[in-house]
A protein has these predicted regions:
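Short hydrophobic/Thr-rich beta-strand motif most characteristic of the beta2 strand and flanking loop
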Residues: 26-34, 42
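Conserved acidic segment of CheY-like receiver
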Residues: 2-13, 17-21
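Alpha4 helix (beta4-alpha4-beta5 surface) of REC/receiver domains from two-component response regulators
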Residues: 64, 85-101, 114
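Hydrophobic/aromatic residues positioned on beta-strands within the core alpha/beta folds
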Residues: 81-82
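Receiver (REC) domain active-site loop signature in two-component systems and cognate sites
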Residues: 57
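Acidic catalytic/metal-coordinating carboxylates
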Residues: 35-38, 61-64
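Active-site beta3 strand of CheY-like receiver
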Residues: 46-52
Length: 119
């Protein structure tokens, strides 16, 4: 199974993503980080293949963490999660920094799994 780390400051969003991922049969959720700094630490300890990370979080946000991860770990695939939709500077910046895709909130299980499977 492919290991996925969920990063979101909202526990309800994180739990929803974890449930979708765990019930898929293709992926296993290896943990939940509440901000970018925790995500970077957990990337070292849990060694996920994929990180689903919120863009806007207190402390270290998703884009800052993505900048760090793209330098430190070229293998991990990062998918950003946002309520901003597919437009705007942050969306473009995430893709420029190496995000593989963006999941828009509110999300549906089929769309989340399609994006993860395409990686």
């Amino acid at each position: 199974m492919i290991k996925v780390l969920v990063v979101d400051d909202s526990l309800s969003v994180a739990r929803q993503l974890e449930k979708i991922i765990s019930e898929s049969g293709d992926f296993t959720c290896v943990g939940h980080a509440k901000n970018g700094a925790e995500a970077i630490k957990m990337n070292h300890t849990e060694d996920p293949a994929i990180i689903c990370m919120d863009m806007n979080m207190p402390g270290m946000d998703g884009l800052t963490a993505l900048r760090t991860l793209s330098v430190m770990d070229k293998e991990v695939k990062v998918v950003m999660v946002t309520s901003l939709g597919g437009v705007g500077d942050k969306f473009t910046e995430a893709l420029r920094l190496g995000a593989k895709n963006v999941i828009s909130k509110p999300f549906e299980a089929d769309n989340v799994l399609r994006i993860l499977r395409e990686l």
